[in-house]
Design a protein with these regions (language model features):
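Alpha-helical context
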Residues: 16, 20-27, 32, 57, ...
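Alpha-helix capping and helix-coil boundary motifs
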Residues: 39, 99-102, 155-156
Length: 171
C-alpha cells in the first residue's frame, strides 16, 4: 500500500498523519517535502546548539556522518551521544543505555524526551494545518489516519472528535 507520513498542526499541537493509498507520484507531496526540508535544515544547527547546552560538546561532523541530507533528527542526536565515548557515564544518557528505563528504543525515546514540543531541544518548524493535510491526502486518493496519538495528544484526547469532524478517517 503506498503511504506517507506527514507532519502537521492542529490547535498548536504537532501531529503525524499517515496517508494510505495515496498517489505517491503526485508532485504536491514532493513540494511539501521540499518546503519542510528547507526549514529542517535551518533548525538543525539550532538543535545542535540546544543539545550542547545540556552539557555536551557534539560536533557538526558527528551528525553529518549520520545524516544523508544535512537534517539532524532527535534520533541522530541520541545515536551520536550514545556512541560518543566521552559520555559513557553522562547522567542524562543513563536511561537510554542497556538496562535503563528508556533503553527499549533508545534513539526514538531520546527524540521524544528532548526534541518534541515543550522539550529543551525543540525547534519550531511551521507545518501545514491538519485540515490542509487531510485535504491533500484525500484529493490524491488516500485515507488520512492519525499516527501515534498517545505521544502527540497526551492529555488532549478531547479534541479527537473535532479532528474526525475535520475529516480524519482513522487512528
Amino acid at each position: 500500500i503506498p503511504a506517507i507520513e506527514i507532519d502537521c498542526t492542529y490547535k498548536e499541537i504537532n501531529l503525524h498523519v499517515l496517508g494510505y493509498g495515496i498517489d505517491y507520484t503526485n508532485p504536491a507531496f514532493n513540494q511539501l517535502g521540499e518546503d519542510i526540508l528547507k526549514q529542517e535544515l535551518n533548525c538543525s544547527l539550532k538543535k545542535l546548539e540546544l543539545t550542547n547546552q545540556l552539557g555536551f560538546d557534539l560536533k557538526k561532523e558527528q551528525l553529518d556522518a549520520l545524516s544523508s541530507n544535512g537534517v539532524y533528527t532527535g534520533e541522530m542526536f541520541g545515536e551520536a551521544l550514545l556512541k560518543d565515548e566521552r559520555y559513557v557515564d553522562h547522567e542524562l544518557l543513563k536511561p537510554y543505555r542497556s538496562g535503563g528505563s528508556r533503553s527499549d528504543n533508545p534513539y526514538v525515546n531520546f527524540y521524544w524526551d528532548y526534541y518534541v514540543q515543550g522539550k529543551p531541544c525543540y525547534t519550531e518548524v511551521i507545518f501545514p494545518s491538519l485540515e490542509k493535510i487531510i485535504q491533500l491526502i484525500n484529493d490524491r486518493g488516500g485515507v488520512a489516519v492519525l499516527a501515534h496519538p498517545g505521544n502527540n495528544l497526551k492529555g488532549k484526547f478531547d479534541i479527537f472528535d473535532e479532528m474526525v469532524e475535520k475529516g480524519l478517517q482513522g487512528v
